Amino acid sequence: MDKLREYLNLLKERFNALTPVQKALAVGIPLLLLSLGAVALIYLSQENYTVLYTGLSPDDLNAVVTELDKEGVKYKISPDGRTIYVPENVARELRLKLAAKGVPRKGIVGYELFDKSGIVLSRFQQLVNFKRAIEGELAKTIMSLDCVEFARVHIVLPEKSLFIREEEEAKASVFLKLKPGCELTPEQVKAIRNLVSGSVENLKPSQVVVVDDKGRDLTAYLDEEFKTNASQLKVKREFEKSLERKLQKTLEEVFGYGKVKVNVSAELDFSSMKKREELYDPDLTAVVSEQKKKERTTSTRAQGIPGTQANIPPATGRQGGGELITERKESITNYEVSKREIYFEDKTIKVKRISVGLVIDKDVKVNTEELKNLIIASAGLDPKRGDQVSIVSVPFVKPTVVAEKPKVPTYVYVAVALVSLVILGLVAFGLVKLLRRRPPAPTPAPAVPGVPPTVEEVRKKTPYEELLEIAKQEPEKVAMVLKKWLKEG
């Protein structure tokens, strides 16, 4: 104990001999490095959690938690009780194991309903179970789509009749809960409708209605009239957005970013025009048909006095009166005036009117008339057509921009921990060298002549070695003494 006090007093003298700056560095740097190393070690030892399942019903959540407890896996549950988190390194393996056990079922029962059916069931119970099984299997299939988070299918099966004329058609409705930011295309809606109709007997696609969680009838997208209206609305929005971007870019380059806000409303004419023209050119004629006819008639003239003598033919060798020859020519030519027919269909979208609304920050001083002329020229507006420009100057609300903290990679913490350990080692090495600088030992008394030094004197330990040995044997007392010195300053 006396040796411990002796060395502790020596250590205290060494510490008191240091300057205040050296004292602060000797105590603060090791503590700081130890703190950094501890923080880095704690962070690296923490497990990263990831989502195992989300959107779970209470029954499914209970089933998943039960299986996780059996596996001895740590988990966390979100405040709303619909999402469960597990360590990232075991998430994939757990999904495979739970899927093999049929967990979670999302509250939907399919053909596995018949696994628990009783021995004796009435015909009505069999029909109900069959309908529930089909509904469940269809819902599972629909939920395999990327955009569908939850699906529910309702089928109405009519009772079979002995008369074909009285037989009714089956009907079905599908409810979909879409994932945030997802929208089904008309092709996907049509595929869902065909899937349901193809899975149920006597169910036509036209008898299937698809509704989403926002109350919209998605089957309306398949109507031709709706497609036309939706297409026209899309063209209108694209036209308006194009003008907005053009004006917004031009004005922000002049007044600065965030100083103006542009809104454009356009009225477009989607009507098409069909035109048919017939042009006649009287100077250009063409022969359509031509017909020519020629007739020639030869007859003998009558001679002498009418009566018997006139009817008696002349004697042989006697030259009688002359012959009568008649010719007739007829020519018919049909002409037609040149005609040209033109068929023309104009499907060009026409702009009927454009209205531009501009909101500008009140801090910006502008000439309203010049700004209006700039907008008219930039957007190609025509006041004669009825185009309008409205400018309003109001103070803008300055949003509070919260800078997103960048995620520090793991290797940065590892590097900090290694550097901290290196610096801690260097500081410890410096302190050891500083403490080993003890004052010169007193001159020992001369040894008795002729008497050699003992082995204990030759192998006598240095004060630093003895101090380390005492600290190992009684660390608690050494710590108490160091704390006392720190308090004394």
From Swiss-Prot:
GO cellular component: a single term: bacterial-type flagellum basal body, MS ring
Coiled-coil residue spans: none
Composition bias type Polar residues, residue spans: 299-311
Transmembrane feature ranges: 24-44, 412-432
Membrane-topology annotation of the record: Multi-pass membrane protein
Annotated keywords: Bacterial flagellum, Cell inner membrane, Cell membrane, Membrane, Transmembrane, Transmembrane helix
Intracellular or extracellular location(s): Cell inner membrane; Bacterial flagellum basal body
Pfam families: YscJ_FliF, YscJ_FliF_C
Zinc recorded as keyword: no
Alphabetical GO biological process terms: bacterial-type flagellum-dependent cell motility
Family: Belongs to the FliF family.
Stored NCBIfam families: fliF
Subunit structure: The basal body constitutes a major portion of the flagellar organelle and consists of five rings (E,L,P,S, and M) mounted on a central rod. The M ring is integral to the inner membrane of the cell and may be connected to the flagellar rod via the S ring. The S (supramembrane ring) lies just distal to the M ring. The L and P rings lie in the outer membrane and the periplasmic space, respectively.
UniProt protein name: Flagellar M-ring protein
Annotated organism of origin: Aquifex aeolicus (strain VF5)
Record lineage: Bacteria, Pseudomonadati, Aquificota, Aquificia, Aquificales
